[in-house]
């Protein structure tokens, strides 16, 4: 928050550039938490409520390692305004698809970095015949990740795919592909799959990749079934304001 506050209010730089800088360099950068954190500091997420870094606070919590001189940091936030963001419909699972999934004998699993614990949860008991963890070559350019972030994410993907392969007793396909959809089709056909299942990515670069997969697989008669973890399905409807109202609603719901 110190960094974001200094960036926005002292240096007077656009918060969007700061968020992009963080997302480019943070190894575990997350589209949602990164964006929301910067918006909150700027006074946009909770309109009118800003976070302004103080020199004494920085000096105290860094044990004097960083002690900005008096008057160097902005003490009054600048007013940032924007047009209201459009409402986005909450995605929900297709119950007909979930029913049809039970009828398939040969199912493949697509693993991506947004959920690398597929050996637990809703997919854990499926009879998976093959696991795919192919890396789309162009995603780094589209996401703006640094080389270190890309390498770290690729290593995490390999680790998650290896665990998935061991859990399901299935062969893992990895490597890079220029066209993820075409690569998945070739993989699915070679493994005689009737369906491919995956946790649906959230808004961000992996969802952008995922949206093209369904139609491409369907064109060769292979179903793509999206899942979402139960806790996300149950909690998302409560995420309409800040953290504390969200927490209170979850507690009230039991």
Model-derived features: positions:
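Trp/Phe/Arg-rich N-terminal binding region typifying the photolyase-homology
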Residues: 24-27, 33-34, 85-254
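Active-site-proximal binding-pocket segments
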Residues: 1-96, 101-106
């Amino acid at each position: 928050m110190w960094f974001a506050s200094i960036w926005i209010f002292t240096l007077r730089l656009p918060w969007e550039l700061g968020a992009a800088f963080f997302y480019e360099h943070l190894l575990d950068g997350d589209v949602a938490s990164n964006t929301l954190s910067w918006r909150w500091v700027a006074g946009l997420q909770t309109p009118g409520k800003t976070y302004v870094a103080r020199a004494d606070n920085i000096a105290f919590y860094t044990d004097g390692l960083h002690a900005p001189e008096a008057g160097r940091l902005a003490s009054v936030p600048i007013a940032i305004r924007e047009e209201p963001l459009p409402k986005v419909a909450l995605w929900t699972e297709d119950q007909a698809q979930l029913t049809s999934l039970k009828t398939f004998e040969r199912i493949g699993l697509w693993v991506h970095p947004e959920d690398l614990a597929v050996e637990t949860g809703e997919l854990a008991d499926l009879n998976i015949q093959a696991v795919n963890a192919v890396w789309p070559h162009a995603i780094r350019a589209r996401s703006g990740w640094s080389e270190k972030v890309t390498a770290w994410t690729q290593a995490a993907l390999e680790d998650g795919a290896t665990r998935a392969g061991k859990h399901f007793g299935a062969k893992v396909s990895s490597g890079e592909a220029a066209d993820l959809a075409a690569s998945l089709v070739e993989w699915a056909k070679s493994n005689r799959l009737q369906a491919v299942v995956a946790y649906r990515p959230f808004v961000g670069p992996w969802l952008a990749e995922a949206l093209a997969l369904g139609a491409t697989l369907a064109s060769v008669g292979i179903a793509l079934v999206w899942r979402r973890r139960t806790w996300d399905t149950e909690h998302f409807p409560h995420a309409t304001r800040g953290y504390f109202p969200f927490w209170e609603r979850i507690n009230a719901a039991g």
